[in-house]
Amino acid sequence: MKKIRIDGNSMNLRDFILVARNGAPVELKDDARTKIKSSRDLVDCFVEEERVVYGITTGFGKFSDVVISCEETVALQRNLIISHACGVGEPLPEEAVRGIMLLRANALSKGLSGIRLSVVETLIEMLNKGVHPIIPEKGSLGASGDLAPLAHMVLVMIGEGEAYFKGARMSGQEAMKIAGIPTVTLVAKEGLALINGTQVMTSIGALAVYDAINLSKTADIAAALTIEALNGITDAMDPRVHQARGHIGQMDSASNILRLLKGSTMTTKQGEKRVQDPYSLRCTPQIHGATKDALVFIKEKVEIEMNAATDNPIIFPEEEDVISGGNFHGQPIALQMDFLGIAIAEIANISERRLERLVNPSLSNGLPAFLTCKGGVNSGFMIVQYSAASLVSENKVLAHPASVDSIPSSANQEDHVSMGTIAARKAMEIFKNSRKVVSMELLAACQAIDLRGKTLMGEGTEIAYQILREEIAQLNEDRIMYLDINKSEEVVKSNKLVDKIETVIGELE
């Protein structure tokens, strides 16, 4: 497997996923080692000189004006970790934890944090050997960074807390011992360097934006299947229409749908059956495309944050300087995560409306009510639409921005916070709900195609139809529907539809 070499400057979303989700090994680049050592040497000088520097020779937050003696610096750093580990709720999933560890190591490898090389190497060794700290999902204000959850990560490094190792939950001390990784004793600046950052919100956000990009392609596939099932009009996808407006995402979505439908005899032209389709079909490129454009923008900002120094204070070895700033503030990611949630929610909104057109006999251009031939005795897809509507409505609540909220903390020293991790967790929940809705549309569209009388389908939609039918048979009479929904979602989750279709018709945008 490809080894990911980090230096604090070159991390991208693809490499992040390889480590967080696929277990790729990580190592420091040589220049990163040099930079880490240089910044640590400067911190040691500050301690020896008893220079007053926030977080090195002072307390934290409201206690920043309390000077700490050289003899107390070790106790200061340990106390910081054990007192700040106040997370609550369920543990974050393994992939998010791995992402957090990777991003924190990457930020430290910039050499601006004043941490010892051996401590960074301990974090990387934990990642490579699969010692995954149990990090509760709740408790971060998003400024100063993700203090509480990151403290839970560091607990394991110092032999405290809990971790998962080889599938078992155990004490941090035991996990480190079994894995053969020595625990660390933190010295001046190191506790602060490890927990003062935005890596929790950024890790969750990176996973969400990566999956959302794939879902946006799957949504185009679902829309194309529904267009076939409803004998939709393809003229609205004409590239001239979308070039006239100029939005790249819109042009890409229309192009995707046309390529997916190429060769289909189930679609129509304007004037053959209708002059124009309803918005949920005709405006799909405009709606999906706006989400695609948002995802491009959000991905760019997330990748910047992946390579950011979000510590405080920041050490500048070349100038022999240290500056207290505010790079830990999560607002740049908080806004993007709220934007991400809204953008993904729109995918579900229009998908549910297309689903409604499939099941509603007044809107489906001749399909049987709720996609069952024996209505009354059978309910068919009636409650599938209910479930989709429920998820869409839940998304509307979740899409309320977290970043507009703030609550003062640390006796008003930290008087504006980002709530970025709440925004990221909400975006991930919206994504999961939206994936389910799109999965329901795919399921219903295949049923509608069967009931319409399947003829020659498009080059891409035929592949999608066959993959789904390999897993889920046509519904001839009522059966337990959640099982079919789950199977459809597993197909979407595996990205099998996108991967297979792209091998035949080329990459979807």
Region spans (language model):
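Polyanion/phosphate-binding surface patch
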Residues: R51, V66, S253
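FAD-binding core of FAD-dependent oxidoreductases
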Residues: Y54-I68, E72-L76, H84-N106, P136-I158, ...
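Glycine-rich, flexible loop motifs
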Residues: M1-R14, L18-V43, V47-E50, L80-P136, ...
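Short gly/ser-rich anion-binding loops that grip negatively charged ligand groups
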Residues: V66, C70, C86-E90, S109-S113, ...
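Well-ordered mid-protein domain cores that form the structural environment of catalytic cofactors
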Residues: K110-N128, H132, A143-L147, A168-V187
